[in-house]
Amino acid sequence: MKTNRDITYLKKCKICGNKNLKKVLFINEQYISATFVKTNINNKLTKIKTPLTLVLCDKSKKSDGCGLLQLYEITKPDLLYRKYFYRSATNDTMRKDLKNVVSSVEKIAKPKKNDIIVDIGSNDCTLLNFYKKKYRLVGFEPARNINYINKGRKIKVFKNYFNYKD
């Protein structure tokens, strides 16, 4: 049961605007998110299904495309992210992986004191908490139901999507 309000469809490439999109993979209808959790039984998400179709922006000689692989179905972001159930801090493997990401960033980018480090989709700020205190840490997280972890660091969290306004 999908409605036009919940799911729209890609009309052109998100990067270059090319309208020539080739279907690469089609998967029959799936629940959009979190529907296996018992606490979500009465949630609207348990009633919304959509197929998953990957499309490729055609970059052949006949087209001016960029080759981006993208999802054809677009689910309304608030349905997916305003009440998000996963927390990075609860998973030991995720914590280790995020710590490794921070280590790699510090080795490659070599940020300096007071540099701004931004985490888009910061969840509970697990990743940002692995950075040294000398940086200015900023997170963007649209989920309204997540408590942010702040282990003695000044982390500025925007409870919204990353956008041009904030």
Where are these regions (language model features)?
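Conserved SAM-binding loop
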Residues: 149-151
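N-terminal juxtadomain amphipathic helix
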Residues: 2-91
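Conserved SAM-binding motif I beta-strand of class I
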Residues: 136-141
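Conserved class I S-adenosyl-L-methionine
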Residues: 113-123
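Conserved alpha-helix/loop element of class I SAM-dependent methyltransferases that forms part
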Residues: 95-114
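Conserved SAM-binding strand-loop segment of SAM-dependent methyltransferases
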Residues: 153-165
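Conserved SAM/SAH-binding beta-strand->alpha-helix loop
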Residues: 143-145
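Conserved SAM-binding loop of SAM-dependent methyltransferases across substrates and taxa
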Residues: 124-134
